[in-house]
Every structure is written in structure tokens, then in C-alpha cells.
């Protein structure tokens, strides 16, 4: 990608975030084009893509035959097919898996590094973009296309926008916003996704979890009414037989080091500590607070105390902006 990522600054929680323009270099874009695109994706992901309109984007999972996620995909219609955004660390293996059956279909599946991914969030993000685009996405119309640019709207943790565009437009936006907006890199967007409870699947956790273990059903990413797709049997069993005992949790507090994706944490049990969970992502904010996204048992007590392994500091559960009640 020729567009240079912005230098990192310590991320800020959404409630205190000034207007910020971010390069999303840790995320990557991929596309499927061709006459069979919709039919092909319908047989591969957990969401009902046949019901998706041009105005929608959604988080879907791409699973193996056992229902474990290769990755999750932020999916939207693009040209005569679909595009999706996923963590850069999983794109290549995810595309390899997706292409396995493509030889029998009229589709082309490819990474897209020509386009640039930017995020805009923070104080008066909408007002800042309203000067630059004739229409912005909203709750009613979550995807808007203008020229070479696609804008995606997100409600949580606070209104923000993901921009998929060409290099020239990315440079124009940077020049226009440079004076009023702080510039930051992917870590700020990652912090917002953790706060929003959007599961982050990096390479360390690819092939490890069924979608429900990361709350995908609560985010509208699983259709239980559509026809078959890879891994469907296991995903359905988890719902209808209550086979899923895990959920995605948000922890905040302090830690002397950031836990890495794939690492476990420790849960306080009386005087002792017991290993628990799998970390998906963690970020340290500019106020020193650590935010951790972790998959753990879905029956954790809300006042449980956790820590990074052998650490002197502690972490506690924070509520997510959505409900897991079915």
C-alpha cells in the first residue's frame, strides 16, 4: 500500500476522543466479483447475504467444517459482488480457505491493496465529514457510496465512520482534516472496536472459536434461517442444543504488560488465581488504562477479578453496548 500509515499515538477512550483520522493498516480489504458472487458467499459465511441491501454492512463469520472461525468479515456490497474488511494477519489464510471451492463458480476472489482504509471518529466526526461528502451514512442507511469512496457508519462505542477509498481521495481527506483532526494509526480503531464489543480475530485465534463464543449472534452476524454453509451444523447445534458455553467479555483496569492475542488470563478464586479465557485483543489507553477483549465462560460473575498472568494489577468486567439475552 503506497499510502503511508500515520504515526502512532496512545489511543483514547471514545468518551474523550477528539476528532481523529486513522489509517487502518492492521485491517485489510478483500473482494469477490463475478456472476456467482452472492451464491458463493451465501454458502461460505454465517450471515444471509441474499438479504443484504446496498445500504447495509454486517459482521459475518467464515468458518471451517467444525464451525470454528477462520476470520470474521465486515461485509458490504461492492460493484457486482462483495467486499469485506478483516484483520490483515488473517487475510491470506482466510482467502486461501475461501478459494477452495471457487474453481466451480464464476467468481474471482482477491485481496485489494489498491484502496485505502481510513477511520474517522471522535468529537463532531459527522460535522467534519459533512464538509467533504455530499451524503453521509447513518443508522437508516449504513453504507453510502460517492465516486471511488464507500463510507460505513458505526454506532458504537460512539458514532464513527470507516472510509474505503482510493489513494488520491485518502490524500485529499488527510490534507483537509490535518488541521482540525488528530492523526493516529490502527491502534485507536482497535481500541474503539474493543469498547464496542466487536470481536477481533487475529492469526493467533484463527480456527479457535465458534461464532457464538465471540457474541456474533448478538451482533446480527448469524442467520439461523438460511440454507447451508460451511460449518453450519456446528453453529446451529451451539444455538439449539445450548452447546456454546463461552462469550466475549470486555475487561478494563491496569496491567504492567499488555497480554497478547491467544494468551490466557487469571481469575481470582478466594486467595488463589486460576487460569481462564483467551485474549483476542488488548490496548493501553493514554490515561494508563488497559482494555482487554477476552473469550471466557459465559457465566462469569460480574464482580469477578482478573489479572494478566502473575501481574500485581487487576482487571474487571465492563458492560458491553449490547445484550446477550436471546
UniProtKB/Swiss-Prot annotation:
Keyword tRNA processing found: yes
Binding site for folate: 27, 189
Keywords of this entry: Cytoplasm, Folate-binding, tRNA processing
SUPFAM superfamilies cross-referenced by the UniProt entry: Aminomethyltransferase beta-barrel domain, Folate-binding domain
Source taxon at top rank: Bacteria
Subcellular location: Cytoplasm
Gene Ontology MF terms in the entry: folic acid binding
NCBIfam families xref list: PRK09559.1, ygfZ_signature
Similarity field: Belongs to the tRNA-modifying YgfZ family.
Name of the molecule in the record: tRNA-modifying protein YgfZ
Species: Escherichia coli (strain SMS-3-5 / SECEC)
Amino acid at each position: 500500500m503506497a499510502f503511508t500509515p500515520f504515526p502512532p499515538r496512545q489511543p483514547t477512550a471514545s468518551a474523550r476522543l477528539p476528532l481523529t483520522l486513522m489509517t487502518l493498516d492492521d485491517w485489510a480489504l478483500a473482494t469477490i466479483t463475478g456472476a456467482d458472487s452472492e451464491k458463493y458467499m451465501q454458502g461460505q459465511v454465517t450471515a444471509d447475504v441474499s438479504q443484504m441491501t446496498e445500504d447495509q454492512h454486517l459482521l459475518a463469520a467464515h468458518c471451517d467444517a467444525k464451525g470454528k472461525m477462520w476470520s470474521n468479515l465486515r461485509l458490504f456490497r461492492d460493484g457486482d459482488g462483495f467486499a469485506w474488511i478483516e484483520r490483515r494477519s488473517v487475510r491470506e489464510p482466510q482467502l486461501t480457505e475461501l478459494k477452495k471451492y471457487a474453481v466451480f463458480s464464476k467468481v474471482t476472489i482477491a485481496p485489494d491493496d489498491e484502496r485505502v482504509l481510513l477511520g474517522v471518529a471522535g468529537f463532531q466526526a459527522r460535522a467534519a465529514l459533512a464538509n467533504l461528502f455530499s451524503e453521509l451514512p447513518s443508522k437508516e442507511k449504513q453504507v453510502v457510496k460517492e465516486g471511488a469512496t464507500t463510507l460505513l457508519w458505526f454506532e458504537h462505542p460512539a458514532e464513527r465512520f470507516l472510509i474505503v477509498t482510493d489513494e488520491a481521495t485518502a490524500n485529499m481527506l488527510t490534507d483537509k482534516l490535518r488541521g482540525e483532526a488528530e492523526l493516529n494509526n490502527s491502534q485507536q480503531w482497535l481500541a474503539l472496536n474493543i469498547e464496542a464489543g466487536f470481536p477481533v480475530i487475529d492469526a493467533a485465534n484463527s480456527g479457535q472459536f465458534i461464532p457464538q463464543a465471540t457474541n456474533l449472534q448478538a451482533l446480527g452476524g448469524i442467520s439461523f434461517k438460511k440454507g447451508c454453509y460451511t460449518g453450519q451444523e456446528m453453529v446451529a447445534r451451539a444455538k439449539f442444543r445450548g452447546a456454546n458455553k463461552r462469550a466475549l467479555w470486555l475487561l478494563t483496569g491496569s496491567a504492567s504488560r499488555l497480554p497478547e492475542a491467544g494468551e490466557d488470563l487469571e481469575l481470582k478464586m478466594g486467595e488463589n488465581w486460576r487460569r481462564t479465557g483467551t485474549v483476542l485483543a488488548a490496548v493501553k489507553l493514554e490515561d494508563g488504562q488497559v482494555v482487554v477483549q477476552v473469550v471466557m465462560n459465559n457465566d462469569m460473575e460480574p464482580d469477578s477479578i482478573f489479572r494478566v498472568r502473575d501481574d500485581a494489577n487487576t482487571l474487571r468486567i465492563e458492560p458491553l453496548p449490547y445484550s446477550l439475552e436471546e
